[in-house]
Amino acid sequence: MLTLASKLKRDDGLKGSRASATASDSTRRVSVRDRLLVKEVAELEANLPCTCKVHFPDPNKLHCFQLTVTPDEGYYQGGKFQFETEVPDAYNMVPPKVKCLTRIWHPNITETGEICLSLLREHSIDGTGWAPTRTLKDVVWGLNSLFTDLLNFDDPLNIEAAEHHLRDKEDFRNKVEDYIKRYAR
């Protein structure tokens, strides 16, 4: 991360002296997305929920990172859930793409990793979807909340998990605990 931040600062310093050739300038250009991410990643790391950790496999690629959520309450307490986030070039006009890498029994996350979280929707009829004013911090806090206050059995993506909870809450809890033991340690 520091590498990209240092590069951006160096590039800003070079803007004043445009003596270099245009071909050389094009190699120094940094996308709007990457400029936003330098600021947003610093804000995210300063305001990360205590149940979350962020990892950047390549510190020069702030647009690809992994999030680990370790809930400290509720059905999913004791589990460790991995999410992969990719921020597209058109960010912040479009939301990041997020996938859950940990198999989970959850009404708002499918077993294949698709996630139902309104702020990850590019278009939303209720106004809760993605907007350019949202940031990575909002995404991380939203994903973290899927394990507590945003856990929603009334508007599920994994209908089978939601119906299971409606039918038999204790058996639902047992299946969640089984998934945690098998996939989320």
Swiss-Prot record:
One of its GO terms (biological process) is protein neddylation. It comes from the Eukaryota. Keywords: Acetylation, ATP-binding, Nucleotide-binding, Transferase, Ubl conjugation pathway. Coiled coil: none annotated. GO terms for cellular component: cytosol; nucleus. Pathway: Protein modification; protein neddylation. It is an enzyme of class 2 (transferase). It catalyses: [E1 NEDD8-activating enzyme]-S-[NEDD8 protein]-yl-L-cysteine + [E2 NEDD8-conjugating enzyme]-L-cysteine = [E1 NEDD8-activating enzyme]-L-cysteine + [E2 NEDD8-conjugating enzyme]-S-[NEDD8-protein]-yl-L-cysteine. InterPro entries: Ub_conjugating_enzyme, UBQ-conjugat_E2_core, UBQ-conjugating_AS, UBQ-conjugating_enzyme/RWD. Its EC number is 2.3.2.34. Belongs to the ubiquitin-conjugating enzyme family. UBE2F subfamily. Interacts with UBA3 and RBX2. Interacts (N-terminally acetylated form) with (via DCUN1 domain) DCUN1D1, DCUN1D2, DCUN1D3, DCUN1D4 and DCUN1D5. Accepts the ubiquitin-like protein NEDD8 from the UBA3-NAE1 E1 complex and catalyzes its covalent attachment to other proteins. Together with the E3 ubiquitin ligase RNF7/RBX2, specifically neddylates cullin-5 (CUL5). Does not neddylate CUL1, CUL2, CUL3, CUL4A or CUL4B. Mediates neddylation of the CUL9-RBX1 complex. This is NEDD8-conjugating enzyme UBE2F. The lineage of its organism: Eukaryota, Metazoa, Chordata, Craniata, Vertebrata.
